């Protein structure tokens, strides 16, 4: 009986070691960004793949690779313990409202994983550009100025405007080139009027809408708090 118990305990120990090895191997496994469990694809078409990144405080991602050109906007402010593949991890401050761009075509694919140190949930919207760069793209081609909107990103592939509206304020009519993606930075209420059609929308953080064509619209903040939008424009 004692020998049988010892044999069972030894078998259990070996199983635990095997499971631990599999978990460690899985921790090192690299997946495309759109297959990482907390990078959720919310829209995919011929132009873009829109990824909603949501990481609760204290949780981490798998190693994942950004292999496509990738504009993004940070929706919340946190500290990430970020580890680029093959390097030591280090803290990186994320500031809500920051609009960035990773040029994978020029710099090569970027592989990393991170832990969200908080405070709170990390939230971001990333936009993978599905089409390769145009051969006739002109570096530094200007994004058309829009009265009442701030240009926060402008390169040969994509631009972005930031729009802020106080309660009761309106902007427009303004023309946004298409295709475009509008991202809400927080809660609020927005009315937009396009060709005499008025639409009321209750906004939430990281909510977005894709417009395949150029649109001319008037925006009105119909809520009690400031509305902030980031409008990405594809070139």
Locate each region found by the language model:
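A short glycine-rich, His/Asp/Glu-containing loop-to-beta-strand
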Residues: 37-62, 66-72, 144-182, 231-232
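Surface-exposed beta-loop interaction hotspot
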Residues: 105, 113-166
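Glycine- and acidic-residue-biased ligand/ion/polar-headgroup-sensing regions
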Residues: 67-86, 176-196
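Short acidic-glycine-tyrosine-enriched beta hairpin
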Residues: 44, 86-106, 196-214
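Bacterial N-terminal signal peptides that target proteins for export
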Residues: 1-12
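Short beta-strand His + acidic residue motifs that chelate non-heme Fe in jelly-roll/DSBH
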Residues: 61-63, 81-82, 102, 108-117, ...
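Ligand-binding loop in jelly-roll beta-barrel domains
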Residues: 106-130, 178, 187, 212-235
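Boundary at the C-terminal end of the N-terminal hydrophobic targeting segment
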Residues: 22-25
């Amino acid at each position: 009986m004692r020998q049988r118990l010892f044999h069972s305990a030894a078998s259990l120990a070996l199983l635990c070691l095997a499971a631990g090895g599999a978990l460690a191997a899985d921790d090192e496994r690299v997946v495309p960004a759109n297959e990482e469990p907390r990078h959720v694809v919310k829209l995919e078409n011929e132009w873009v793949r829109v990824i909603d990144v949501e990481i609760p405080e204290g949780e981490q991602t798998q190693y994942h690779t950004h292999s496509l050109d990738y504009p993004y906007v940070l929706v919340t402010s946190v500290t990430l313990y970020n580890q680029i593949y093959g390097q030591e991890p280090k803290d990186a401050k994320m500031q809500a409202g920051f609009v960035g761009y990773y040029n994978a075509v020029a710099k090569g694919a970027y592989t990393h994983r991170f832990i969200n140190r908080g405070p709170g949930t990390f939230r971001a919207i990333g936009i993978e550009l599905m089409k390769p760069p145009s051969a006739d793209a002109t570096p530094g081609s200007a994004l058309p100025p829009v009265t009442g909107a701030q240009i926060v990103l402008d390169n040969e592939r994509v631009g972005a405007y930031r729009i802020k509206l106080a309660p009761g304020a309106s902007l427009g009519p303004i023309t946004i080139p298409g295709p475009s993606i509008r991202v809400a930075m927080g809660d609020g209420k927005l009315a937009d009027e396009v060709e005499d059609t008025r639409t009321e929308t209750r906004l939430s953080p990281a909510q977005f809408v894709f417009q395949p064509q150029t649109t001319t619209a008037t925006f009105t903040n119909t809520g009690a708090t400031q509305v902030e939008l980031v409008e990405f424009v594809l070139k």
